[in-house]
Amino acid sequence: MKIVLPVISGIFAILAGALAAQAQMKLPDLKKQPSAQAVLDEHFAALNKCDWNRLLAQYPEDAQINLPNGTIVKGRAAIGDLFAGFCKEPKDGGLNGIQFAVEHSTTIENTFATQWVATAPFLAEPYRGSDAYITHDGFMQAMVTTFDGSALKMKK
């Protein structure tokens, strides 16, 4: 319990900061992609540039992201908050500069089961994970991720 409380407090602090930042950011117009593969490619390209507008242009209002430990982020505004925190500079608690590379991906209709590796100048070692990306009608409808920022090993 001693470890869980600071972690939960840290998550709430990051989300509160992201909410404040999001209040100043307008959600971008949706941008439909021509194929499921184009949705996935755009996601990784936007994520690697920490391009908040491009990321959010993929997610319709009823989208959701399932995070580890049972957390579900629902709706564009909440997803915007999540990525606003993620795209902060490392000195501000974000991960801007992290690069995700697909190592393996299996496609089943409009869903991708994707193994990736993340690297960054501020990481002590590569971090691997796996996500399911569910696309629908040219958008990112849902994502199930194993990404756990607290498991990243940062350089000292």
Feature roles, as predicted:
Residues D81-P126:
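Surface-exposed, charged secondary-structure patches
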Residues I8-A18:
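Bacterial N-terminal signal peptides
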Residues M1-S9:
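Bacterial N-terminal signal peptides that target proteins for export
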Residues P126-K156:
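Short beta-strand edge/turn micro-motifs at domain boundaries
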Residues A63-K74, K88-G93:
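A short gly/proline-enriched turn/hairpin at secondary-structure junctions
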Residues A20-A57, E61, M154:
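Short, low-complexity N-terminal intrinsically disordered segments enriched in polar/charged residues
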Residues H43, L55-L56, A63, G75, ...:
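Hydrophobic pocket/interface hotspot
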Residues Y59, A118-A120, T146-F147:
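Short beta-strand segments enriched in hydrophobic/aromatic residues
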